[in-house]
Curated annotation (Swiss-Prot):
Residues 37-60 are annotated as: NMPbind. GO terms for molecular function: adenylate kinase activity; ATP binding; ATP hydrolysis activity. Keywords: ATP-binding, Cytoplasm, Kinase, Nucleotide-binding, Nucleus, Ribosome biogenesis, rRNA processing, Transferase. Belongs to the adenylate kinase family. AK6 subfamily. ATP binds at residues 17, 19-22, 113. It is found in: Cytoplasm; Nucleus. Monomer and homodimer. Interacts with small ribosomal subunit protein uS11. Not a structural component of 43S pre-ribosomes, but transiently interacts with them by binding to uS11. It comes from the Eukaryota. It comes from Dictyostelium discoideum. This is Adenylate kinase isoenzyme 6 homolog. It holds the Pfam family AAA_18. Residues 112-122 are annotated as: LID. It catalyses: AMP + ATP = 2 ADP; ATP + H2O = ADP + phosphate + H(+). One of its GO terms (biological process) is response to oxidative stress.
Length: 175
């Protein structure tokens, strides 16, 4: 099913601590789009199957999340952020951004969040093994998946500029 939208949908994904939520919020605000923070929505709207005490997070119910956001996503104009990406419907997104962060910086960010050592190690391993990038490449058309560095403030500014320019190009092609 190919649905014509007036605004694009963008997924910003990456290992926890790569700056997804911050970047998604800025992009949504600067481009008059909606920011959908999946992790917050899972908690607030009870889109989960309980609590995972080992990883200290809710166990996301993918079907509940998809049902909750289907109508919103069909309309377009959304910037979604989440550390997982392979379970979203492919039709939802026009651009998939995978943020990557230097391991030392990522470790520092996760420690500041007071993550336990098991959770930090698991997330660092995911970043080293590029798990999220591989999931994105295996789940979406190659031409919509873009890997961006997210280690420095300059990276963040460059990413904002890249995505904003991409949005402008999308409007020119689609409206």
């Amino acid at each position: 099913m190919n649905i014509k939208r007036n605004k694009p949908n963008i997924l910003i994904t990456g290992t926890p601590g790569t700056g997804k939520t911050s970047l998604a919020g800025v992009i949504a605000s600067n481009n008059e789009m909606n920011h959908i923070d999946i992790s917050s929505a899972v908690k607030e709207k009870e889109l989960h199957d309980g609590w995972d005490s080992e990883f200290q997070c809710y166990i996301l119910d993918e079907d509940k999340v998809c049902d909750e956001f289907e109508d919103v996503m069909v309309k377009g104009g959304n910037v979604v952020d989440h550390h997982g990406c392979e379970w979203f419907p492919e039709r939802w997104f026009d651009l998939v951004i995978v943020l990557r962060t230097d391991i030392k910086i990522l470790n520092d960010r996760l420690e500041k969040r007071n993550y336990n050592q098991h959770k930090i190690t698991n997330n660092l391993d995911c970043e080293i093994m590029q798990v999220i990038l591989d999931e994105a490449r295996n789940s979406y058309k190659q031409e919509i998946v873009v890997e961006l560095p997210s280690t420095t403030l300059e990276d963040n500014e460059n990413n904002q500029n890249f995505i904003s320019q991409w949005i402008q190009n999308w409007y020119e092609k689609n409206n």
